[in-house]
Design a protein with these regions (language model features):
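SAM-dependent methyltransferases
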Residues: 1-23, 165-166
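C-terminal binding/interaction regions
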Residues: 3, 22, 98-99, 103-167
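Glycine-rich phosphate/diphosphate-binding loop of Rossmann-like nucleotide-binding domains
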Residues: 12-62
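Structural motif
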Residues: 25, 67, 82-84, 118-124
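Short, ordered loop/turn segments at secondary-structure junctions
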Residues: 30-31, 62, 89-90, 125-129
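Electropositive phosphate-/nucleotide-binding environments in soluble metabolic enzymes
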Residues: 33, 37, 41, 62-66, ...
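Short helix-capping segments at alpha-helix termini
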Residues: 48-53, 80, 115-116
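Glycine-rich phosphate-binding loop
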Residues: 67-109, 165-167
Length: 167
């Protein structure tokens, strides 16, 4: 939850997993590419910074945010992909179109998480204006692509800890 005076793209990096051999898919909506390219750059750089290798980061492009759901399902269903990051931007318009898209994508990505038992990260911005979107793609509110990548890393690290509880 971002506020006017807070940049949330600062994370605790305690206890992060070793990402050697971990494969990520980043699915990027082409609509509003001025923003989504910055989100992708942030996510990619964060994965590299914390130990992922470039050859283990796969990029897939989709026309718009609505298509993120199916593409994330395809990637998450692939046994070789460990986590999927969905990046998009749906800006408020004059109609309720954005409400329908945002709800469908959020619900769809939630369902992909549950169906595949893999981290599928919702990195879709839902701003009122392009200015707000840019503020969250490397501007005063940080880069939500960074946050999506860190969320994927932390979720990958959590699963083995939970599995150990089984004994």
């Amino acid at each position: 939850m971002s506020s006017a005076d807070k940049n949330l793209s600062v994370f605790s990096t305690d206890d992060l997993p070793d990402l050697t051999g971990t494969k990520f898919a980043i699915v990027v909506a082409e609509w509003n590419s001025e923003v989504t390219e910055k989100l992708f750059a942030g996510a990619y750089q964060t994965l590299i910074q914390y130990g992922a290798s470039a050859e283990n980061i796969i990029r897939g492009n989709v026309p718009g945010s609505f298509e993120l759901t199916l593409a994330t399902q395809w990637y998450a269903s692939n046994a070789q992909v460990d986590a999927v990051i969905a990046l998009g931007v749906v800006i408020q318009g004059d109609t309720k179109h954005n409400d329908y898209i945002n709800h469908a994508v959020a619900q769809g990505i939630t369902q992909v998480n549950l169906n595949t038992s893999k981290p599928v990260i919702f990195g879709v911005l839902t701003p009122n204006t392009m200015e707000q979107a840019l503020e969250r793609a490397g501007g005063i509110h940080g880069n939500k692509g960074d946050e999506a990548a860190m969320t994927a890393i932390k979720m990958i690290g959590l699963k083995p800890k939970i599995d150990q509880l089984k004994g």
